[in-house]
Each structure stands twice: as structure tokens, then as C-alpha cells.
Amino acid sequence: MMNSIKFIFLGDVYGKAGRNIIKNNLAQLKSKYQADLVIVNAENTTHGKGLSLKHYEFLKEAGVNYITMGNHTWFQKLDLAVVINKKDLVRPLNLDTSFAFHNLGQGSLVFEFNKAKIRITNLLGTSVPLPFKTTNPFKVLKELILKRDCDLHIVDFHAETTSEKNAFCMAFDGYVTTIFGTHTHVPSADLRITPKGSAYITDVGMCGPGFGSVIGANPEQSIRLFCAGSREHFEVSKCGAQLNGVFFEVDVNTKKVIKTEAIRIVEDDPRYLKQDYFNLI
């Protein structure tokens, strides 16, 4: 008899829209897919940057089991020491020792579920613009894999470019259970089970504002940035909402992914879709 574990992985939670669409839909999704575990990237949960203690607890109450992060992990300074040390939260692993917060939290964790040792790892790509140094994610993950201390290994690769994520997949196909790209907030159309049995997608997408936003932010600010080089704090758009994620099932005996499916829910507000931004150019 096959022993399998079913997972839901949700992309970057961005602001109030992302929090609420998860709260309103996660229980139904867990029931639909009979999911055993839910993993969420929460690096943009609090006003678009970082994760506060209040919103960490919000996600847990909504039914999230484990949380991954990204380049905005350290933005919510007030709650940082508490949140980053939560046993079910994984911040980026490949931090250089010169980074002030490199010794806070964990970049990878191992837990047991259904007689399987499961590892979750969070890594930053070399293509993400950062104000601090990181170590090479390829070399860091290889070193971790060589420990051979888990049955399943779920990797959240928080990176900017499609080429780096594709290269990551080619390098680690069959050596980890999943390689899920995060960070760009736009879901890619390449979800697949690789020839060696890993699940891969270049970017899962986000749980946040809908199509009336620019990857979650107000369009006006993004247009001014690209047209005039305007540098301002991006505000989270109030237009509708979208939820993007991946369902996947793993055969514990073979350690291979046997099923994947993209998850997408869109709840757009037509008022924002009809806005005219032409005169901003």
C-alpha cells in the first residue's frame, strides 16, 4: 500500500489582501486536496515587507503549518527576535557571517510526519538585489544534501531571474523533492514533475492584491519608477485579491512526487481594472 503525503505550498503573502484570501479559502483548499501540510512564503505579509508577530499568529490560525521567508525577512524589527526564532519558520539559509542577523533563526529545518523525515529549506538567489552579503545557494544546498538526513526535501528558492531558477532545477533535479521559485509574485506556467521525480515551478506567484496592481503595489508608483526613476515606498494596492500556490503529493516509499496541480483563485475588483494611467507617462 502506497504511503503518501499531500502538501499545499502558497506563494508570497503580500499585505492584507493576501492574508484575507488565505483566511477565506485555506480550509476549503485543504479539504479539496486532502492536504496533510501547508507551507506558505510569508516574507511580504505585513504591509508588503516582513512578518510581524500578529500576522504570524494570523497565518497559524488560518491553518498554516510551516512558513518560509525571503529578502524582507528582517524588515519588521519590533517583533524580529520573537518571530524569526519560531520553530516552524525558515528564513534564508545562505547568509554571510558579516550580516548582522545571520545567527538568528534557522535556514533549514527537519521534522517527522507520517514516518518520514521532511526537510524545508529557504535560499536566496544570487540575482536578488540585497543590502547584505549572501553565500552561494548552489554550494550551500549541495552541502546540505550531502548530509543525507531526510526522506523528503522541500526547497523554496527565493530568486529574481528565471535563468537562475532554471539552472537551480537542472542542478538539483532528483536530489530534492521540490524546487519552488518565489519572489517575483507572477505565477509561471511551467509547473511540472521532472524526469527524476522532483516538482518544479519557476515562480509560484503571490497571495496578494489582484490584477489591478503591479505585483501587489499601486500601479501609479510603479509607473513613476519606470518612467521617471521615482524612488518611493511602495504602498500595497487595495484592488481585489489573488491566491497562487501548488498542490503536490509525494510517495514516501519512492521519495518521488507523483502529482502536482497549480492552485489559483482570483477575486478582482473591476473598479481598479478600469483605471487609466496613461497621463502618468
Curated annotation (Swiss-Prot):
Enzyme category, top tier: hydrolase
Residues that, per the record, bind Fe cation 1: D12, E43, N44, H185
GO molecular function: 2',3'-cyclic-nucleotide 3'-phosphodiesterase activity; metal ion binding
InterPro entries linked to this entry: Metallo-depent_PP-like, YmdB-like
Entry EC number(s): 3.1.-.-
Binding site for Fe cation 2: E43, N71, H158, H183
Cofactor names: Fe(3+)
PANTHER family: 2',3'-CYCLIC-NUCLEOTIDE 2'-PHOSPHODIESTERASE
Family indicated by similarity: Belongs to the YmdB-like family.
Name of the protein this chain belongs to: Putative phosphatase/phosphodiesterase MPN_349
Origin species: Mycoplasma pneumoniae (strain ATCC 29342 / M129 / Subtype 1)
